[in-house]
Amino acid sequence: MKKYRLPKNKRLLLACLLFVSMGSMAQTIEKWYINMPDILNPTLSKQNRMELLEYHKAGQGDSIANLFKHQAYLLKFDTLNQHITVKNTPSSTFEMKILNQPDSTVIIGIIRTVCAPVCMSTIEFYDTAWHSIPLRFTMPTAIEWVDINKIPTEKIDLQWVKNLMGVSFVSLSFSDKDQTIQAKNNTLDFLSEVDRKVIAPYVSDKNLSFKLKDRTWQRNQ
């Protein structure tokens, strides 16, 4: 039986496609972190980022001086779950995670958290060409942690509670176990000791969890 062979030009095209595909698959959290545009992480240069990871891998430490001469610390470097967290400055943290999708596309998630002194986060998503992806994530508000039904309305005014929790301080993080986002309510840290004592019994200390579905991050119930 005569074997069929692809024309030479088609074989070359197929080889190129395979090469590009393999190159994309070979990219790791380390490569994405080091080679990201500096504007996304202006506190540490590309050289800083590379040296920070190289020192860690060589067992020579987990810190390096940032561009402002403060120490930056590597808090997490998980190559298995494609997750990295760096304390860029004494009051700010940078977190990156690779989110592999069922259709083989790759999403790069970035969380920036600033504690001044109460912690708050922002979150962004990028494709592998570092174009911003408009995935919808609605930051939860502090009132979502309050169990309104348990508040004794004869003693505590509900409108006072809503006003008190009207300013939200929420920090985000990527889960180590799966591709979810965890939201932590830090608003109690912003309140006076008197107000905190009144409202704290009705505020959950559990994180809220969000998963990606149809380009929207939805809260897990």
Whereabouts are the PLM-identified features?
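Bacterial N-terminal signal peptides that target proteins for export
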Residues: K2-L13
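N-terminal signal peptide c-region/cleavage motif recognized by signal peptidases
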Residues: S21-G23
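Terminal domain-start segments
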Residues: Q27-L99
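Surface-exposed loop/turn elements that mediate protein-protein interactions on large endomembrane-trafficking
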Residues: L74-H83, D127-R136, K213
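Short consensus segments that form the blades of beta-propeller domains
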Residues: T85-V86, T113-C119, R196-P201
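Exposed beta-strand-loop-beta-strand "reactive/processing" segments of non-cytosolic proteins
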Residues: K97-P117, A183-N186
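Mid-length scaffold segments of soluble, non-membrane domains
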Residues: V106-P140
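Short aromatic loop motif centered on NTY/YTY
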Residues: R136-L212, N220-Q221
